[in-house]
Amino acid sequence: MALLNFRKKETPAPQAPVAEVEALLKDYSIEVMPRTAEKVEDFRALLPEGTRVYIAHIDGTPIEDMVATAARLNADGFKVMPHFPARIIKDRATLADWIARYQGEADVRQALLLAGGVTTPAGEFSDSMQLMETGLFDKAGFTRLHVAGHPEGNRDIDADGGRLNVDAALKWKNDFQTRTDAEMAIATQFAFDAQPIIEWADSLKAAGITLPIHIGIAGPAKLQTLIKFAIACGVGPSLKVLQKRAMDVTKLLLPYEPTDVISDLAAHKAAHPDFNITHVHLFPLGGIKTSATWVQENGGASGVPADAA
């Protein structure tokens, strides 16, 4: 199998200065699920004050569990941003009920709107644009709405591996900025290689899409764990980064860390201050504590936990 075709290790690329990495990681966000959040004894010992915490809503997760997780994080002083996956929401009444629960029990004012991973919609919604068009988020006074981005495409949307449909959807969402009082941004799927990310971000800017980008980055994890998630999530060309790592026998059993991709993006951001990637969003595939600790060790002041500040 090509993945295990060992070769001599390449010379490591130079790392960006600590200050540049710290700047890119400032106000980073992280993603949890109710079951992963349960394993964390104290979020304030791990995350900086006011960190935005996304709560992924996997099909089958009771809304009660989602709201309870949101309430805990809100009480700890974090900005809570639950997922609203269109295809698992039955109808407008269900959406209104979820919003009311989140706001009544957890003071939620932010949301990530996305189609969701299921193939067949549970009801009347099939994409995030339909959720936005209900007007319910503005009616409830949401201050921030994020939408999904895919630096390497999404075959659930463009079966040919292209970007025609996914880019058209982003243009629609970009135009929606003028119809909502909420601040908007793109939160992306994770990728492992900076160059395709930079090219994608530049292409959006060239197409007139002005939404700021919160780039998805996989936190430290075992190589086999990352490969499993990358394939399941449709991560494309940047899988080569993992393949290259697997060719180095000395690294096979060591956890992957996002040092290189963060360093490359930080250097690009420092050289191009108007770069439209404004924040990092961490997917803690190797564990919440592992990802938070990595930021503490590599992000300078941007990683200082709330209880240590």
Question: Where are these predicted regions, by residue range?
Answer:
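Substrate-binding cleft of secreted/luminal carbohydrate-active enzymes
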Residues: A270-I288
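Active-site pocket-lining/capping segments in soluble small-molecule metabolic enzymes
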Residues: V32-P34, L114, D127-G153, R163, ...
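Conserved, mostly hydrophobic/aromatic
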Residues: P82, K173, A182, I215, ...
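Short, surface-exposed basic-aromatic patches at helix termini and helix-loop junctions that form
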Residues: R72-A75, I99-G104, A201-I209, Q296-G303
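Hydrophobic, aromatic-enriched interface-forming segments
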Residues: G161-R179, E183-K205
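Active-site beta->alpha loop and helix N-cap motifs at the rims of alpha/beta catalytic domains
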Residues: A2-A168, D175, G287
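Glycine- and other small-residue-rich loops at beta-strand/loop junctions that grip anionic moieties
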Residues: V32, I58, R87, G162, ...
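Active-site glycine- and acidic-residue-rich loops that bind
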Residues: K90-A93, V118-D127, T188-A201, L223, ...
